[in-house]
Swiss-Prot record:
It catalyses: protochlorophyllide a + NADP(+) = 3,8-divinyl protochlorophyllide a + NADPH + H(+). This is Divinyl chlorophyllide a 8-vinyl-reductase, chloroplastic. Keywords: Chlorophyll biosynthesis, Chloroplast, NADP, Oxidoreductase, Plastid, Transit peptide. The keyword Glycoprotein does not apply. PANTHER family: DIVINYL CHLOROPHYLLIDE A 8-VINYL-REDUCTASE, CHLOROPLASTIC (PTHR47378:SF1). GO terms for molecular function: 3,8-divinyl protochlorophyllide a 8-vinyl-reductase (NADPH) activity. Its EC number is 1.3.1.75. Optimum pH is 7.0 with DV-Chlidea or DV-Pchlidea as substrate, optimum pH is 6.5 with DV-Chla, DV-MPE or DV-Mg-Proto as substrate. Residues 1-58 form a transit peptide. It comes from the Eukaryota. Coiled coil: none annotated. It holds the Pfam family NAD_binding_10.
């Protein structure tokens, strides 16, 4: 997989989204609440004690919800305006589920979409504007919208910074579980990541901590189930060089371009798989790694594919991986003296990780990444995505503060 590099902005920016339809007035069912100050994220060495998850109330949704028709199965979605979350909302609506979508009042790249655009984009879901980092606010804002049968959490920290990872990937995700259980949810689908198998980064540790919370809740209450979805790579994270190569520049990669590989999956296919987790009892209480169709591709193969689609001879720039190691060493040293540099050091480690670690399932017997052990799903291919970006550009697939080369 191509390396994830720092953008020119180290501060958090809003996640990307596709262009919204024409704005319309917010309907009466939309809930607004002023965002409270977000709690501080976890610091290294701080213990994290999860608040106990309240059991669902007596008037909760019926537990055997899988016997109900989709039109009778209400699903809560947090992270609904994110890259994957908005496709999950659309897929659930397409299948006939009533959807309660928790959103930020402003979404899209650098918050360019206001509340009206958010409501229009997620229609006909019931949109609830709330602060997922504030447990009390989230529960209060959602209280009029129960009961629900299942929940899908698509939350993710925007850049993977140390405190932001614990604030969002763990704490806000825990708040989603607490609120969902309070409204009667009997199943919880977590959008995690395949890279948590080898946790060297703060956001991976935060995600793993919450995965443990889900397992503990299922152990405490046998009527509750979960599905942990661990996708490989997203198409948009591999499309950052299409425009530059199209404009005549070489394709940039680390080492020989064979340090890592991935089986990328489209947002539509991943959303369909996540929706399957609600209705398919065979996916309950399981960790589900998932990739797209076809064989795993190295950065070298991705570059060769791109040049072939453009009808050009391949031209590559091969960057020694040691360049990143040196930068990380310097940033780590600075972070010990200047705490404000801590996130910059973490971002460097994220880039190094994605430059050298495959987004595939780890074979427990060999300790190696395995293409064969990584399940495939869907029909959308990276080649089709590249063809579309060559024709139409990256509109709706902007990378925000996470930029590939």
């Amino acid at each position: 997989m191509a390396a994830l590099l720092l953008s020119s902005h180290l501060t958090a920016a809003s996640s990307s989204s596709t262009t919204s339809p024409t704005a319309r007035p917010a309907p009466s069912f939309v809930s607004f609440r002023a965002a409270n100050a977000a709690p501080k994220g976890a610091r290294r060495g701080w213990p994290f004690l999860a608040s106990s998850v309240e059991p669902p109330p007596a008037a909760s949704a019926a537990q055997p919800f899988r016997s109900l028709a989709p039109s009778e199965t209400t699903v809560l979605v947090t992270g609904a305006t994110g890259y994957i979350g908005r496709y999950v909302v659309r897929e659930l609506l397409r299948r006939g589920h009533p959807v309660v979508a928790v959103a930020r009042p402003r979404s899209g790249l650098r918050g360019r979409n206001g509340p009206d655009e958010v409501v229009a984009d997620l229609a006909p879901a019931r949109v609830v504007f709330s602060d997922v980092t504030d447990a009390g606010a989230l529960r209060a804002d959602l209280s009029p919208h129960g009961p629900i049968h299942a929940a899908v959490c698509c939350l993710a920290s925007r850049g993977g910074g140390v405190r932001d990872s614990w604030r969002v990937d763990y704490r806000a995700t825990l708040h989603t579980l607490q609120a969902a259980r309070g409204l009667g949810a009997a199943h919880f689908v977590l959008l995690s990541a395949v890279c948590v198998q080898k946790p060297l980064l703060e956001f991976q540790r935060a995600k793993l901590r919450f995965e443990g919370e889900l397992a503990a809740e299922a152990s405490r209450d046998p009527s509750f189930t979960y599905s942990i979805v661990r996708p490989t790579a997203f198409f948009k994270s591999l499309g950052g060089q299409v425009e530059t190569v199209k404009n005549g520049q070489p394709y940039v990669m680390f080492g020989d371009g064979k340090l890592c590989a991935c089986k990328p999956i489209s947002e539509e296919d991943l959303a369909a798989f996540i929706a399957d987790c609600i209705s398919d009892e065979g996916k309950a209480n399981k960790i589900l790694p998932i990739g797209g169709p076809g064989k795993a591709l190295t950065p070298l193969e991705q570059g060769e594919m791109l040049f072939r689609l453009l009808g050009r001879e391949p031209r590559f720039i091969k960057v020694p991986i040691q360049v990143m190691d040196a930068a990380i060493w310097v940033l780590d040293a600075l972070a010990k003296v200047f705490p404000g540099v801590e996130d910059a050091a973490e971002f460097g480690k994220i880039g190094r990780y994605y430059a050298s670690e495959s987004m595939l399932v780890l074979d427990p017997d060999t300790g190696e990444y395995s293409d064969e052990m990584t399940p495939s799903y869907g029909s959308d291919t990276l080649e089709q995505f590249f063809e579309r970006v060559i024709r139409e550009g990256m509109a709706g697939q902007e990378l925000g503060e996470q930029t590939i080369f």
